[in-house]
Structure formats: C-alpha cells, structure tokens
Design a protein with these regions (language model features):
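A short, surface-exposed loop/turn module that caps and links secondary-structure elements
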Residues: 43-67
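Residues that recognize and position ribonucleotide moieties
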Residues: 3-4, 52, 85
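Generic alpha-helix structural propensity
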Residues: 31-34, 40, 51-54
C-alpha cells in the first residue's frame, strides 16, 4: 500500500527509529514504524481489518472518515483512506485525553 504523510515530520519518523523516538518517544516510535511496515505490506485497505492486533476502528464526530489503530496504551495512529491502495497518516496522538 502507498502511504502519504500529513507532515514532513511524520514522514521522517517513518524512515528512522531515531527520528521516531525523538518525535514520539522510543516505545511509541518503535510501534509507529512497525505499523508502517504492516501498511506497506498490505495490498488493500480492507485487509487491515483482518489484522486484529491493529485494532483498526472508525472514528466519529469531527473525525468521521478517519480511522485509528493502536500503538501503545492510549496512543493511536490516525489514518484516512484515500483509495483502496493508498492511505494518509494524519497524526499520532492520545485522543482519549481530549
């Protein structure tokens, strides 16, 4: 699957564990990179729902059209589907603390 990034910092963090660790902290940065590996290895968006460990789920309200997958604890990787073979990484956040 092709991945687009909402920001250059998110793109840089996807290339380097050092960058990911500086941006998110090491445990979250490591999971971020692992999730990108899964996304790149997946052919179609709908296949992501078969990966139970991702806990991919749609968001509601102002985030309608966006999806979240678990990184660690309350931290989620927020994505949106662009096409069946293309996603955009929007953010990594603890949206439960809002």
């Amino acid at each position: 699957m092709h991945i687009e990034f909402a920001t250059n910092r998110l793109a840089d963090a996807g290339i380097s564990l050092v960058e990911a660790g500086q941006l998110f902290g090491v445990p979250i940065g490591r999971k971020y990179i692992q999730r990108l590996v899964v996304l790149r290895a997946t052919d179609k968006y709908t296949q992501l729902f078969g990966h139970r460990a991702l806990r991919l789920h749609p968001l509601k309200g102002k985030r309608t059209g966006q999806y979240a997958m678990t990184l660690t604890g309350n931290y989620r990787l927020i994505i949106e589907k662009i096409q069946e073979d293309r996603v955009r990484i929007l953010d990594v956040e603890d949206y439960h603390s809002d």
